[in-house]
Amino acid sequence: MVTPREDWLKLTEEETLEPELPICDPHHHLWDRPDNRYILEDLLGDTNSGHNIARTVFVEASSEYRRSGPDELKPLGETEYVHKNSGLQGNTDIIAGIVGHVDFTLGERIGEVLDMHIEAAGGKFRGIRHASARDDDSSIPAYRKPPRGLLSDAKFREGFAQLQPRGLSYDAWLFHPQILELNGLAKAFPDTPIILDHIGGPLGIGPYAGKRDEIFPMWQADMATLAENPNVVVKVGGCGMVTYGFDWHKQERPPTSQQLAERTAPYYMWCIEKFGPDRCMFESNFPVDKASYSYNVMWNAFKRMSKDFSTSERASLFHDTAARVYRLI
């Protein structure tokens, strides 16, 4: 992951568009790493940069784990840490919802661990992300290094089945060749809400570099198939990740919101067309996407590309879908 450069980001600064429009940012992280810090004060620096961020949702990032005890309980440390950093900051409900991590391959007994997360989050626990993103090519970075076919694994599904009785959702992080694997999971658990992170991970590096024209229609077809499942919603964002191959981080200056909107609209508009605004939510994915553009410019881009939607459709995209799916209001 590329570390964000604040001095570089300042080379492209813009006036905030429609600063009154309420936004729920449904995907950000917190971590304190030697080479890449993003703690509460950094998050607040972004959420206070001009847009009306009404509330946010934290998504697990393997940070602040417990250093001792059983492995399956170590992620509880992240939930505990994040809960301590949550609360009202000005007009923003920071971390109104928490998406944590458990290892579903532990099967049915993971239910007890889910109950511990729910208790540790003080009423803010909303779901689990157990990432399945992987590729056979070693040049593609894999978060958690999951095995092939994880979403079809019997033990994984045994653990996954513990979500619905607790009213919890599942955040899916995968790459575009795996979208149809999620389709199978969604059909097997039609009553469990599934949130697909970052538009399904259309890769643009390694063996996928320079093949955007070939990959895009394949991604479109698989996303259209996935959209047939009413329990699946999509986080619209994530194209600032280096793995998507847009290479904004290599430019002399960061992109403007107009440039960003033009480059990403084919992906984002396809998701909205197939899933509908009531099953799509704009996201920041900060600080990961911060390698490519600033928080203010990013939300300006979302506002530009959605300007032709109705007031109610835009309310869904910027706030209401996320607030409903994560049960924030």
Question: Where are each of the predicted segments found?
Answer:
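Mid-to-C-terminal alpha-helical segments outside catalytic/metal-binding sites
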Residues: M1-P22, P26, Y38-D46, A54-R55, ...
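Active-site gating/metal-coordination segments in enzymes
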Residues: V2-L11, P70-Q178, G184-K187, G200, ...
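Catalytic pocket-lining loop regions of alpha/beta-barrel enzymes
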Residues: P4, P146-M281, S292, S310
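Short, well-ordered coil/turn segments that N-cap beta-strands
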Residues: P19-P22, H51-R55, N91-G97, G122-R126, ...
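Histidine-centered catalytic micro-motifs
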Residues: P22-R33, L196-I199
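Conserved, mostly hydrophobic/aromatic
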Residues: H27, T56, V82, I98, ...
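Catalytic metal-binding/acid-base residues of hydrolase active sites
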Residues: H29, S62, D103, A133, ...
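Alpha-helical scaffold segments that flank or form the walls of functional sites
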Residues: R33-D93
